[in-house]
């Protein structure tokens, strides 16, 4: 009987490892705000290591790229992510992961919150785009930056005045610098309203409990001052989720943590 029990345990392990071996991890790897294209090398090292690990990777140009900044509303970005996921499945991916750098992080969270069961893990790298803190004039900034807060208030007034779909200049803040962004008031609010799905603290509690999340933040990233409580602690508990601090800034975090990210994905994305 003892031999039979050992045999059955070994057989179960063999079947489990065989099932895992048949799984194929597919990754949608999303750049940050005004990134993407040949000018942006922030994700190249991570991209290469994912491919070397046998993952299927799509690294698309998103609506907030340097060339498209910012095209359409938040819903358009979600639709594009869905299309990329479908392409991964068509090429053999059985487990889908969303990996986002900076603004790619709230996009990944938002898609997973809106589409339970569609993704199996999330990796948020140097998360950025923070409508809640924009609405507070970025309290951890060395100087008060109220440009987005004021622009959101103006955009709301434009919507109320019947000008929701008129394109005009609004304000964005990217790594401490204010910059104009040409959008309709309606579209702008989907990205910058602190109550919108572009705000990570809004979508984090809506993530399915079975979806593990990796949060990677550099020790020289301004957002590290807000710690785990801003978003990570709002996620449903999952034993595979991890909050990882690395010696990096906002732009270098994905490359510095590339090996750790890939190793985490190989474990967390599989059943």
Give the role of each language-model region.
Residues 23-53, 61-64:
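Short, surface-exposed "cap/lid" segments of acyl-processing enzymes
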Residues 33-34, 218-222, 247-249:
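Acidic beta-to-alpha connecting loop that harbors the catalytic carboxylate
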Residues 71-91:
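Alpha/beta-hydrolase active-site loop
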Residues 87, 95-151:
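Primarily recognizes the serine-hydrolase "nucleophile elbow" in alpha/beta-hydrolase
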Residues 125-203:
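Accessory cap/linker subdomain of secreted extracellular hydrolases
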Residues 207-209, 215-217:
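Short beta-strand/loop motif that positions the catalytic acidic residue
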Residues 222-228, 253:
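Conserved alpha/beta-hydrolase "acid-adjacent" motif
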Residues 242-271:
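Catalytic active-site module of serine/aspartate enzymes centered on a nucleophile-bearing elbow/loop
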């Amino acid at each position: 009987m003892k031999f039979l029990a050992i045999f059955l345990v070994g057989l179960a392990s063999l079947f489990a490892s065989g099932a895992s071996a048949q799984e194929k991890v597919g990754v949608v790897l999303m750049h940050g705000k005004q990134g993407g294209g040949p000018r942006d090398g922030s994700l190249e090292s991570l991209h290469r290591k994912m491919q070397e690990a046998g993952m299927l990777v799509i690294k698309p140009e998103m609506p907030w790229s340097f060339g498209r900044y910012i095209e359409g509303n938040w819903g358009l970005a979600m639709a594009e992510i869905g299309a990329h996921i479908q392409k991964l499945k068509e090429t053999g991916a059985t487990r889908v992961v969303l990996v986002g750098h900076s603004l790619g992080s709230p996009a990944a969270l938002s898609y997973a919150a809106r589409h339970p069961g569609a993704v199996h893990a999330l990796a948020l790298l140097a998360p950025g785009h923070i409508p809640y803190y924009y609405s507070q004039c970025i309290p951890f900034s060395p100087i008060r930056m109220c440009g987005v807060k004021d622009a959101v208030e103006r955009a709301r007034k434009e919507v109320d005045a019947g000008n929701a779909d008129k394109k005009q200049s609004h304000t964005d803040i990217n790594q401490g610098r204010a910059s104009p962004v040409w959008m309709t008031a309606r579209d702008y609010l989907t990205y910058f309203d602190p109550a919108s799905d572009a705000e990570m603290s809004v979508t984090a509690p809506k993530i399915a409990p079975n979806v593990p999340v990796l949060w990677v933040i550099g020790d020289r990233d301004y957002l590290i001052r807000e710690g785990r409580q801003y978003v990570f602690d709002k996620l449903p508990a999952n034993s595979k989720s991890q909050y990882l601090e690395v010696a990096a800034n906002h732009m270098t975090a994905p490359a510095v943590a590339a090996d750790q990210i890939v190793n985490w994905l190989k474990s967390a994305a599989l059943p």
